[in-house]
Swiss-Prot record:
The protein, known as: Mediator of RNA polymerase II transcription subunit 10
Origin organism lineage: Eukaryota, Metazoa, Chordata, Craniata, Vertebrata
Molecular function (Gene Ontology), one example: transcription coregulator activity
Assigned GO CC terms: mediator complex
Taxonomy, superkingdom: Eukaryota
Keyword ATP-binding on entry: no
Subcellular localization(s) per the UniProt record: Nucleus
């Protein structure tokens, strides 16, 4: 799988370099540099075709749109992953707290119901396979 990404990365780097060189030629265009411009434009088209071929190899990869927002804002896309993990961790802690609270509530409820309705709770515990009723 990594070789697919390496291949795409290589093609993208070549494409970006080609665009950089094309920008240099265009910014200081001379009629004598027309042949070089045409060559760079052909390389540009070939580069787009190569990138399109890579796209076919990576058709099953999905990227969250928020990653592109990070890139558009000039932020590191790896920060998106870090922030997602931090949000997931915080949500996990929150849910764990709720679960612990509900377990404590269940324990206290069973304890109090056992005081008020000892026979019914003994039957309940027997059905649930929990503590056996006192003899």
């Amino acid at each position: 799988m990594a070789e697919k990404f390496d291949n795409l990365e290589e093609h993208l780097e070549k494409f970006v370099e080609n665009i950089r060189q094309l920008g240099i030629i265009v910014s200081d265009f001379q009629p004598s540099s027309q042949a070089g411009l045409n060559q760079k434009l052909n390389f540009l088209v070939t580069g787009l075709q190569d990138i399109d071929k890579c796209r076919q190899q990576l058709h099953d990869i999905t990227v969250p749109l928020e990653v592109f927002d990070y890139i558009d804002q000039g932020r590191n896309p790896q920060l998106y992953t870090k922030e997602c993990l931090e949000r997931a961790l915080a949500k996990n802690e929150q849910v764990k707290g709720k679960i612990d609270t509900l377990k404590k509530f269940k324990s206290l409820l069973i304890q109090e119901l056992s005081k008020v309705f000892p026979e019914d709770m003994a039957k309940y515990k027997a059905i649930r396979g929990e503590d056996h009723p006192p003899s």
